[in-house]
Design a protein with these regions (language model features):
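Non-heme di-metal
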Residues: 1-190
Length: 190
């Protein structure tokens, strides 16, 4: 069944455009975070930007070519501080997972595109995770807790991998001397 001329086709293009724009905004936000001394947050913005690219690609691949006219609204041109950018990013992710994609999934389902509906629902789950991550980072920035915790944890240098144990990240890496901006909470993903 062709999606040409359907509401689902329009929703896919809106989603492609939204994800593509989010990717660009997140790369801009990463530059600000880096300048403000938040290498980890810059890394999170870049990682999320790449994930948004994959979402855009997934939506784009459902389209069947030609010109499609859409009417949509997107965030326009404000790059703020890292805290402001985290807040804006969290709000955008919230709108996607709680409003847009569930509605787009419903429409796709009604139009008989169950596979597309499932993709909208699954990407909505990812966007909820993005929002949660941005809100956690925002809370840490606002509380001055990016490089400090209430309990002893393991910190790791993003540059050389040195691991340090303490409540506060060292001001500079004891191994490679990179500044505190490169220190983050150690995560095991193996």
């Amino acid at each position: 069944m062709s999606i040409k001329g359907t509401k689902t086709e329009q929703n896919l293009l809106k989603s492609f455009a939204g994800e593509s724009q989010a990717r660009s905004r997140y790369t801009f936000f990463a530059s600000v975070a880096k300048k403000e001394g938040f290498e980890q947050i810059a890394g999170v913005f870049m990682e999320t930007a790449e994930q948004e690219k994959e979402h855009a690609k997934r939506f784009f691949k459902f389209l069947e070519g030609g010109m499609v006219e859409i009417t949509a609204s997107y965030p326009a041109g404000v790059i703020g501080t890292t805290a402001e950018n985290l807040k804006a990013a969290a709000e955008g992710e919230n709108e996607e997972w709680s409003d847009l994609y569930p509605e787009f999934a419903k429409v796709a389902e009604e139009e008989g595109f169950t596979a597309i509906a499932a993709v909208f629902r699954n990407i909505a789950k990812v966007e909820a995770e993005h929002e949660a991550r941005y809100r956690t980072l925002l809370a840490r920035v606002e509380a001055g807790k990016v490089f400090e915790r209430d309990e002893v944890i393991l910190w790791q240098c993003r540059n050389c991998g040195f691991v340090y144990e303490g409540k506060t990240a060292p001001k500079a890496c004891p191994a490679c001397a990179h500044p505190q901006a490169y220190i983050e909470e150690k995560k095991n993903n193996y």
